[in-house]
Structures are given as structure tokens and as C-alpha cells.
Amino acid sequence: MNLKKITKTALAGLLAAALAVGLAGCGKSGADSAKSADGKKIVTVAHTNYYVPYDYVNEQGESDGFEVAVMKEVAKKLPQYEFKFVPTSDDDLLIGVESGKYTVGTKGIWITDARKKKYVFPKNNIGASVIGLAIRKDTADKIKDLKTFAQFSGKIVPIAPQDARYMVIDEYNKENPDNQIKLTSSEAFQVADAYSWVLEGRYDGYLDVELSYKNNIAKEDAPYHQFDDKMAYVRYKGIPTYPIFNKKEQAFADDYDKAIEELRAEGKIAELEQKYFGESLSDYLK
């Protein structure tokens, strides 16, 4: 019997087995039941690293923001989990939660039908963002809301159908069949174009998230601050924002729901809204 040949065969078998185990391990998602030293399930909370005041990294290099703060309060309510916060980009968050790299993600997300196919949405929202119209200042005395905008002209900058803002105008039109906004679809364009089209009179309004308007125009260091003296913003309503969970994390989403309901009843959510926004954005959901 050739001992050398047997040894090589055995070694090859061991390597194959080790490789199979390694591949099996790689097939498991990061959201699958990792345990800490004390037996708690580790959950990774991805959040955007720039979206002040919702989700960002502060000057001390720490995860911060309203939604991050809420999730940290949720963590206190759920001692069976160990929360790890990971600041990242928009794309990595969305892809990572879908693939299981992250357990849950927060980035001021609205519900859409397309997103519901990829993620678990909890029953309870985490917060809200305000949506409204960027208009010319010379029309501000006539345009006070969507109804008066529709009466004025209804000429709104086109919106891509997959954009959650399209749904906002579509719902308004369904509720107001006799006072429609001229909703047309478009592909993506630069936000500077939208503001320019409104200023030129090509359209009379651009549906914009208030925070985006502030960051793009209202702030002194905003990239399009030169438009500030010619444009105005009209609030419409609040849109609920949600954390998104990996599809395998329904149980964790259910636990989140219980915790968030307790926090809301205790007034903690309202307290954090005042801290980060200076007002209750939840009031705009009513």
C-alpha cells in the first residue's frame, strides 16, 4: 500500500471538507442570529452618515441623529439584543439590509410598494419628514398649499414614478378629482434644474422635502443659496419614516414595534423631536 498516496488523498479530503464548511458559513447573512458573549442576539443598525438631523456622524465620530437616538432608546427596551450602529452610504445601507449584511437600516425612509417587496416594514413609524412645494416668491401670496397650487396652475416639475414623491401627488389627485395637479413622469434630473425651471416659469412648483430645500437653498452655505431671495417654501404635510428590516427579521421588527409604542406613550419620541428638530414633526402626520 502506498502510504504517501493515502496521506495525500486524506489531506485532499480534509481540505475539501474545510472548504465546504467555509462556503456554508459565507452563505449565512450578517443578519442571521450572531450572538454576543452573554448570549444576546447581535443586531447591526445601519444608518446614513450625513443626513443631519436624522442620521449622521457627529464631531466626536459617534452615530447621532433623531432616528439613531430613537433606535438607541429602542435598544434600552430590548435587552435581549445587542445593538451595533454602523454609519454608511445610502446604497450600502439599502443593499446591505436586503442581503442581510445589516439587520436594520434607517435613513428617513418612506414606504413604497417596491420597497415592501425587498424589506420588512414595521407597523409603527420611527419619525416623519415634511414635504412641500418650492415656489417663486412672487407667487407666495396665491399658493398656500396643494389646493391653491392646483388652482393657480398645477404645473409641477415632473417626478419619476418610482420616486415616493410621485405617490404624494397621485394621492392628492385621487382625493381632489375636480382640482388636479398636472402630474407627469420623468427620468432623473439634477435638483438644480428643478429650481431653475421653477424660477424660469416653466413650472410653478417643485415637490421637495423640506430638509432638502433647507440644505440646498435656505442655508447660507447651501449650494444654491443664490436662489434664496427668489424662492419660497410651502409646507404640505408630514410623511412617516420607517426603519427597514431584513426579510428574515420579522420577529425583531415586532419587538421594535412594542418598544416604539412604549416610547411614544412615555413621551420619549416627542422629547427627541424637540431636541433634533425644535418641533414635533409628528403633528404634521395628523
Residue ranges and their predicted role:
Residues A31, Y81-K84, Q162-S185, K258-K286:
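Ligand-binding clefts/hinges and TM-proximal coupling segments of bilobed small-molecule sensing domains
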Residues A34-I109:
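Extracytoplasmic small-molecule ligand-binding "clamshell" domains
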Residues V45, N49-V52, D64-K76, G132-V191, ...:
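Bilobed "Venus flytrap"/periplasmic-binding protein-like clamshell domains
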Residues N49, G127-G132, D221-D257, E279-K286:
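Periplasmic-binding protein-like
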Residues V68-L78, K137-A140, K147, K155, ...:
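Extended ligand-binding regions for polar small-molecule ligands
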Residues K84-A150, A232-V234:
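Acidic, polar ligand-binding/catalytic clefts
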Residues K84-I95, L183-E200, S212:
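Short helix-initiation/N-cap motifs at beta->coil->alpha
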Residues D92, E98, G108-K118, V168-E171, ...:
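A ligand-binding cleft/hinge motif common to bilobed small-molecule-binding domains
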